[in-house]
């Protein structure tokens, strides 16, 4: 929520904060590369899992087809077929244009550069959202943003590059929801839903679902008149954005349904997916195990101090309605991770194979938002935020 409705933050300082968030995330990735001996600081690369076994092959195929022709059709697909679904689901990212600039043998190293650039832009987007959401130009915001750009989801699931563009857009989309409620402007929301749907419709579905919960959270925290009128504008903006992307969405969905099979098969069950007592552990420990990919627990870690601040938010002197709204949203997200049927809805009504709770980055973003609310009210030391 807005930290101080009378505050008038400096736009110049806000822009500086966005740049600082970009540089801070970029520097953190560069430091990790240096410590791990990744190029250009060593001979290692970050190619692992699906990035190495799947996406490098797709990017190489795209690189060759751009130069040799045949973008819409390939004989390498079974006995030949359309590549529209493959492009829309796996390759529809503006960052992939960077691969086309360099020789094909440089793809492993370009992938590392793309990860660093995308992470830096994700931090900048989060800082933009925090600055607008809190109406603040505090120098703590770039550090707060780092916890989102390098949260457990962004690091562990970074090998699935198809999801990361929408992870970048998520803070901007929430900022657009704020703008709709505060000023009535709807075009930013329409534009961002369009971009998210074009970049990856699978993750866009998750962000759009969360935006509904976030809209209700904002409204319940500070109710005002005209709920149905404004909610109608919110729904219309989202539908318009998705509709503008229909030229790519509809044929792509049909092709993915044909190739993957059972895209819309529903097996709604209320069975738990994991022991609920394990969930708090994921907030305070960020160590990686292979079960993080193959198991069922969500990747929620976004900083120990951020999780502690989110807890302090509920003990702080904030409006009761705001705390109730935040608790309801957190409960809805926790149940979505825990209950199989709800989990299935978030994953497009198809059970995921590995990489569980692919929407958990949204929970990390909201936890950082609550942490920022408590942080800007109490202003603990900057060093504590990095814990």
Task: State the predicted function of each range.
Residues 302-333:
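Hydrophobic, aromatic-rich transmembrane alpha-helices
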Residues 1-38, 233:
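Start-transfer (signal-anchor) and selected internal transmembrane alpha helices
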Residues 113-122, 164-172, 208, 301-307, ...:
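Membrane-embedded alpha-helical segments of multi-pass membrane proteins
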Residues 21-25, 226-253, 265-268, 323-333:
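Hydrophobic alpha-helical membrane-interfacial segments at the cytosolic entry of transmembrane helices
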Residues 180, 203, 327-335, 340-341, ...:
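Contiguous transmembrane helix-bundle modules in multi-pass membrane proteins
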Residues 28-123, 146-167, 206, 256-261, ...:
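Membrane-interface coil-to-helix junctions
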Residues 119-132, 139-181, 185-220, 233-253, ...:
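Membrane-embedded helix bundles of polyisoprenyl
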Residues 4-11, 132-136, 178-188, 217-229, ...:
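Membrane-interface junctions at the ends of membrane-embedded or membrane-associated helices
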